[in-house]
Amino acid sequence: MSKPVIAIVGRPNVGKSTIFNRIAGERISIVEDTPGVTRDRIYTASEWLGHEFSLIDTGGIEISDAPFMEQIKQQAEIAIDEADVIIFLVSAREGVTDADERVAQILYRAEKPILLGVNKADNPEQRQDIFDFYSLGFGDPIPVSGAHGQGVGDLLDAAVAKFPTDLEEEDDDSIKFSLIGRPNVGKSSLVNAMLKEDRVIVSQIEGTTRDAIDTKFMAENNQEFTMIDTAGIRKRGKVYENTEKYAVMRALRAIDRSDVVLVVLNAEEGIREQDKKVAGYAHEAGRGIIIVVNKWDTLEKDNHTMKEFEDHIRNQFQYLDYAPIIFVSAKTGVRLQNLPAMIELVSENQNRRIQSALLNDVLMEATTVTPTPAINGKRLRIYYMTQVAVQPPTFVVFVNDINLLHFSYQRFLKNQLRKTFDFTGTPIHLIPRQRK
């Protein structure tokens, strides 16, 4: 099911990022800290009392060279386009300003629920003195303090109560995938080329609230796929469409809904920082990943070119050592016919379940070949392992002391699982648990 989206909007210096971080809390790093992954806190998954949602800080979207009010206007429009619930943030310290009133004018046309949060209400007097904000026309102001956390729960209670009840259920059997990558890597031409590869387009599904178009098609083996619409592929250019952070935000939304993510690189331009950033998000979200090098036809090649390019990718994306790499050309169609089977394989590996008996056979063999380490005379003992989840495959390993299970030995155990059960294209998570 698509998760609801909350966007925080307001003029500069009202504390949007403080509220964003307060709501997001530690969930920004919920999966793991991955070396080589650059985080951008503009967009994160969060949860309140069992309700999962995505959170956008529009203040993190900076439109370069745009006038002050034009930036605010565009940030508000992003919220109107993307969000299910909008938090309009103002400041108790400054009271109602001209800039607040201009933001309000833009938000009046939004056919979305809007909550008025009065930030920096850090003491009882400020929490009481919020009546002027009724003049903005968004109902009861909700006093909050991003610095101290007061009132944030009330704001989230109000937001959750406004979540739409008709978000599209995504429980069909099709494999959902998206193509992500910075502008000019050829996502659009790759989409069009894939849909021309002797497959039948089943339907184009209009998104309920967000202009997205998902395309279903059938592969030759009758496996159904859903191509998730991604930033900039079909949506025509508004001013902010080309800003890097906005593109990243849209890519994250696509990742959120995908089973498998195709990270598209441009063979002509090589690997850029934004490539690594977005790929890192897909990795940390636990999605299946395929690295697709497009425009392969444009390079002059010899017998070593592909191997050298692959080695360069492995060096730059060390945390994606499990992701297969395919070199394609949307223009000539080379190797595009291999993509559906590769997507299907990665999806199967994402959903692979291993019986506990087989896992413990692997564990026994692994600890025999490479005995467990000892720290300060105390040796790690591993009792057993069991799988607790899929998408991605997640395993709990029970030990005598979790402090003895060093990262390097965890990596060794993961490698043994991959060696035995493949898991091509999917991250695997290992959770140590201390047996009492």
Curated annotation (Swiss-Prot):
One of its GO terms (biological process) is ribosome biogenesis. Residues 352-436 form the KH-like domain. Residues 4-167, 175-351 form the EngA-type G domain. Associates with the 50S ribosomal subunit. GTPase that plays an essential role in the late steps of ribosome biogenesis. Belongs to the TRAFAC class TrmE-Era-EngA-EngB-Septin-like GTPase superfamily. EngA (Der) GTPase family. This is GTPase Der. It comes from Latilactobacillus sakei subsp. sakei (strain 23K). The gene is der.
